């Protein structure tokens, strides 16, 4: 790739589509992905943040509009779809969550729909929004799938982890939660260091696996679309991109469902009284 960022080879094309639109928090200037080194702690992927916020607001506005205009008569298509999603999530929470909190069902609904919407950005033509961003707004780079950004998925997983700690302390108390970490699986004071290591690893592995699983699947899916577009001539891309897009619909739905299910299960485990 040239210094100006001009795309000349398939390798440049693939690398260009893997660059984020980044903001340097120290200078509040956009980072040029073609002339700088690796991202630092002080860089913010504002494209991922922007699309995740926009999709979250879209979810809230649509569901609020449907709730405000819902009727007891024959529902429209949008109301029917929303009711099916709510019913599906509610049944999942009833089956998997055994606590008493009334927050879990709305949380599960938010997680499922939000992650699903972010995943669905992967079905857009790979060059559509980046082309608009570059030629209309002059952006040096743009990625549109928030869940293909590990900082987004781990941030969501961190939120779940905080809720796990909150419900564990709420249901068991500080002493009970501490005892759970230090006296399991070996109930003897001499094994407290071993128990703390084992339980600490088990506790930390939940948000890590939750975030990395979603990121890994969505990053791989996005990369396959980029490879198809970057390595094949335009007239033959549809032969692979269309079947992969159809199969990818299953993947993005399944990943949203898995993220929701694991969130419910982890919070159910945290809400159990011992």
Curated annotation (Swiss-Prot):
The lineage of its organism: Bacteria, Pseudomonadati, Pseudomonadota, Gammaproteobacteria, Enterobacterales. The keyword Cell inner membrane applies. The chain crosses the membrane at residues 43-63, 103-123, 149-169, 223-243, 245-265. SUPFAM superfamilies: F1F0 ATP synthase subunit A. GO terms for molecular function: proton-transporting ATP synthase activity, rotational mechanism. Belongs to the ATPase A chain family. This is ATP synthase subunit a. It comes from the Bacteria. GO terms for cellular component: plasma membrane; proton-transporting ATP synthase complex. The gene is atpB.
């Amino acid at each position: 790739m040239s210094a100006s960022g001009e795309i000349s080879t398939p390798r440049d094309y693939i690398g260009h589509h893997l660059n984020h639109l980044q903001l340097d928090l120290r200078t509040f200037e956009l980072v040029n992905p073609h002339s700088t080194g690796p991202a630092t702690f002080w860089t913010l992927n504002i494209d991922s943040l922007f699309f995740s916020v926009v999709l979250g607001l879209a979810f809230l506005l649509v569901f609020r509009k449907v709730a405000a205009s819902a009727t007891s008569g024959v529902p429209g298509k949008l109301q029917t779809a929303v009711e099916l999603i709510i019913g599906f999530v509610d049944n999942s929470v009833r089956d998997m969550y055994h606590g008493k909190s009334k927050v879990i069902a709305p949380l599960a609904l938010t997680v499922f729909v939000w992650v699903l919407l972010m995943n669905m950005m992967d079905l857009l033509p790979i060059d559509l929004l980046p082309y608009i961003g570059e030629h209309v707004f002059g952006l040096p780079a743009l990625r549109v799938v928030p869940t293909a950004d590990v900082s987004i998925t781990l941030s969501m997983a961190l939120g779940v982890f905080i809720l796990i700690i909150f419900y564990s302390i709420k249901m068991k108390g500080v002493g009970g939660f501490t005892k759970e970490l230090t006296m399991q699986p070996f109930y003897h004071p001499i094994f407290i260091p071993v128990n703390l290591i084992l339980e600490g690893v088990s506790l930390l592995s939940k948000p890590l696996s939750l975030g990395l699983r979603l990121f890994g699947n969505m990053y791989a899916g996005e990369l396959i679309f980029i490879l198809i577009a970057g390595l094949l001539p335009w007239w033959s891309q549809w032969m692979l991109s269309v079947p992969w897009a159809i199969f990818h619909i299953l993947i993005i739905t399944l990943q949203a469902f898995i993220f929701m299910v694991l969130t419910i299960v982890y919070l159910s485990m945290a809400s159990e009284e011992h």
